[in-house]
Amino acid sequence: MTVVEIKNQIEKYKISKKKIFVTSSFQTQSIAMLHILSNIVEDINVMFLHTGFHFPETISFRDKVVELLGLHLVDVKSLVPKIQQKDGNGQFYFVSDPDYCCFLNKTQPLEPYLMQYDVWISGVRADQSATRKKMKVEQQGPFDIIRFHPMLDWSAKQIYEYRMLHQLPEHPLDKKGYQSIGCVPCTRKFDMSNERSARWFGMNKTECGLHTDLIK
């Protein structure tokens, strides 16, 4: 989608009085969409899934982007304290059961918001993984929410060019070889063959679970 097409689609949602929110991981690849939205929708809620395991650099970058773009940030956190997120052997779930860890810290905390809103905007791109390649620009999500993926057909090159054009900052870990940045325990440096392979390294896992329900 072009920027104009994104704007037109969001205007349709607004005319229909649909309640809209966006989720963002606040990586460099997130900033193009956030910049576009900040120029279209005033006071849109930007949900950040604050797991408590993020790199300090991610939190700093998030705060910088929020201030730069004038975003309304909502920290979404698990009801289960981090210290209690351990299995019967005392291991953190990110070690013994990463799927359950993602459920506790991402999927479950977001569910109440899915029931309150009509449209969920996400910056997933088809070139990020095989799972995301199967997604559509607009499709039905859980709790009858509309999933809108305006950046789905954008490439990493387009994101970069947009960022350069608008002089937008990059995540400080990019220069250190981290291109897909999530929680500290589950993030490794970039593998050119698969952008998402830097996440959950060695676990045969490239998605946290927020988007897998869209793939049939």
Feature map (PLM): residue ranges:
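Nucleotide-activated chemistry modules centered on ATP-dependent adenylation/adenylyltransferase
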Residues: 1-216
